[in-house]
Amino acid sequence: MKKTQDGYVWRKGTGVRKGNLHCGGVVDPPERQTAPVDYIYDAVVIGAGYSGLMAARDMTDCGLSVLMLEARDRVGGRTYTVESDGFLYEMGGTWVTHHMAYLFQEMTRYKLDRDLILTHDRQYANDYYTINVPGATPRKLSHEEAGEITARAWNIFVNVDGQNCRAICPLPHAQLDNILVDRLEVERYDKISCRDRFEEIKHLLTPEEAGILTALLLHISGGSMENSSLWDMVRSHALMSYSPDNFGPIWTTFKLRQGQSALARAMFEEAVDNGLQYAFQTPIKSVIDETNVVKVTTTGGKQYRARRVVSTIPLNVLHTISFTPPLSPTRQQAIAIGHVNHMTKIHADVKGSDLTSWNGMRYPNLLMFGYGDGVTPSGNAHIVGFGKDERDVFVPERDPEKAIDAFQKLHPMEVEKMVFHNWNTDPWSQGGPAWWRPEFMSKYQDELQSRHGQVFFASADWAHGWRASIDGALEQGSQAALQIIRELKSACNKPVKARM
């Protein structure tokens, strides 16, 4: 298995080291270009995350000539798997579910829908939950009781319409302009922050409920209570079939046994079999749309031409790319604002297996939640810790001792190793998956989803339904590919797969 330049590992004896982690998503050699230098592709896809993979696979499958350009050395974008000491660590997106239609379709296509493993194993010694929040005595409790506390607080928080969100968000894949709810009514709720809503209902909550709810909202958004949109929580509730009982089954239970990079690699290899050309470790700096052809220039000075371009560049990175003609003022404003998710995710190998069955939370803390997630080949518990935006005081690769302290504040433990990716200091992400500010959806979603001449924008960061998730990335890549296929096949009558 090849090694990626991404990610960090901390060990007691060596400290923090960057990269050099085995990853099945690494593409080596990094280039395959057999087309002539002056070739005009049907499409250039910028980015090899799930949006880009979906678009490239679908377009090559329908006979279009496609070039993929990717800044990283691997497929997967903000979702990838590394192997260290015989154990798989999910560095970005992790959990899968049959509830996500686009994702389930891909899992089925590559026969991964039943090749799953479970995150939580209840057979180990510390089979309990710990809670530590202001105004309440820290304590141990059962996982079931912790779930009940969380569910009650969440239900009070999201029930903004008195009908468990079913009135205001009946069609979560069509939140704006659906046939049941007036857009102006949705926009009214979209103006509300999580802080605003929390202040409305906090008198109904116990200290434990208030603390765990606050931490959960920040865990989800990766931002602050003030800059996190209430609507994003309403949307999430609707997507979970209007029940917090589905938090676990949908968001934190099932993983691909072979890892996310196995799925990403399968999509990539099928596209390659269909004739996909590609260049990895190839950042771009500009996109020039000349109507009949679009020119994409790399930071290394190479230029590629295509009839269409699919940009899957994350929202928080788009400001680094020059577009000609300029993007609309509305899109430029959205890009300047960006999204709020600057979360932290750190894997820890903890001495002994006892904490494998433990989950817990502490707020405030640099890592608010910890989840037991399997046993390493050496017999240690694998714990995953999550925190909100702490960029001003915490940079994990610079402050590993703060990370260890945060784990130990969640529960006494001896951390022997940490594995992580800092998406906030990563130039190709500049944050995690997109969670939005109040009013951002109302003002900018339509524009972010729209095309700009012959340039299509496809990213989970502005998906219709599962925004910020793998499913949303696949949705956006699929929709961009479908439109380009229709346009180009109509113009050129290409019925078969292309081979260079």
Predicted regions and their residues:
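Flavin (primarily FAD) binding-site architecture
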Residues: 309-330
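N-terminal Rossmann-like FAD-binding beta1-loop-alpha1 element of flavoenzymes
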Residues: 38-68
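Core beta-strand elements of the Rossmann-like FAD/NAD(P) dinucleotide-binding domain
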Residues: 39-41, 299-308
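Conserved flavin/dinucleotide-binding core of flavoenzymes
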Residues: 2-30, 293, 358-500
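A conserved short coil-to-beta-strand element within the FAD-binding core of flavoproteins
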Residues: 280-295
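Mobile amphipathic helical/loop "lid" adjacent to a hydrophobic cofactor/ligand pocket
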Residues: 2-11, 15, 118-228
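Active-site/ligand-binding neighborhood in enzyme catalytic cores
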Residues: 173-283, 312, 322
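Glycine-rich FAD pyrophosphate-binding loop
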Residues: 60-84
